[in-house]
C-alpha cells in the first residue's frame, strides 16, 4: 500500500500488474469465469442460429485451457446441460500429477475435433493457441476471450466470428 504520495520506490503500474497476475492465477478466478460463461451460454447463446450456436473460449495458455475445460465440464454436468465442451491445444501438459492431451480429455482423437464440434452435444470449444487462425465454423456465434490480444492476433482471432450463416448474430 502506498503511504507516501511521491515515494520513488513505489511503482503503481507494477503493483497493479502484480496484483492482477496474482488474482488471475488463482483457480477460483477460473471457476468464477467458467460459471459466467456457462450461464451466459445457456441464457443468451445456445438458442441462436436456429438453436445450433457454438461458442469458443480463448485461454491464455494450455494450463488455463485445461482448467477451463474441467470447470466448464463440471458445471455443465451439474446443471444437467445437454451440452459438452471440447478442449484444443498442442502437445501434453502435466496437471495436478496427471499428464493430459486433447484425446485423453475429450475422449476422441485430435483429428476429430472440428468434426465433433459441428454436432451436438458439443457446443463449447476451449482453445489454447489453436483454432484462432484459419478456422472456419459458421455456427461459431460467441467468443469468450481470457487472453491479451493485440494487433493482427486480435483481428485473426475475432475474425473466427465473422463467418456467414443465415440468421447469425455474433456476441463478443
Language model: regions and residue ranges:
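Interdomain helical connector at the RecA1-RecA2 junction of SF1/SF2 helicase-like NTPases
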Residues: 1-52, 69
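Conserved two-lobed SF2 helicase motor
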Residues: 120-132
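Conserved motor-coupling elements within RecA-like helicase/translocase cores
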Residues: 96-122
Amino acid at each position: 500500500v502506498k503511504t507516501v504520495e511521491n515515494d520513488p520506490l513505489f511503482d503503481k503500474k507494477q503493483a497493479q500488474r502484480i496484483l492482477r497476475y496474482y488474482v488471475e492465477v488463482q483457480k477460483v478466478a477460473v471457476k468464477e469465469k467458467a460459471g459466467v460463461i456457462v450461464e451466459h451460454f445457456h441464457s443468451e447463446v445456445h438458442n441462436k442460429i436456429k438453436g445450433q450456436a457454438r461458442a469458443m473460449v480463448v485461454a491464455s495458455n494450455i494450463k488455463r485451457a485445461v482448467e477451463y475445460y474441467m470447470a466448464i465440464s463440471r458445471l455443465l454436468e451439474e446443471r444437467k446441460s445437454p451440452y459438452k465442451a471440447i478442449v484444443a491445444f498442442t502437445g501434453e501438459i502435466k496437471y495436478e500429477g496427471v499428464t493430459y492431451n486433447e484425446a485423453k480429455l475429450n475422449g476422441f482423437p485430435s483429428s476429430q475435433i472440428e468434426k465433433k464440434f459441428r454436432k451436438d452435444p458439443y457446443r463449447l470449444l476451449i482453445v489454447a493457441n489453436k483454432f484462432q487462425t484459419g478456422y472456419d465454423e459458421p455456427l461459431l456465434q460467441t467468443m469468450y476471450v481470457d487472453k491479451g490480444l493485440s494487433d493482427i492476433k486480435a483481428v485473426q482471432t475475432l475474425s473466427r466470428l465473422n463467418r456467414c450463416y443465415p440468421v447469425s448474430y455474433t456476441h463478443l
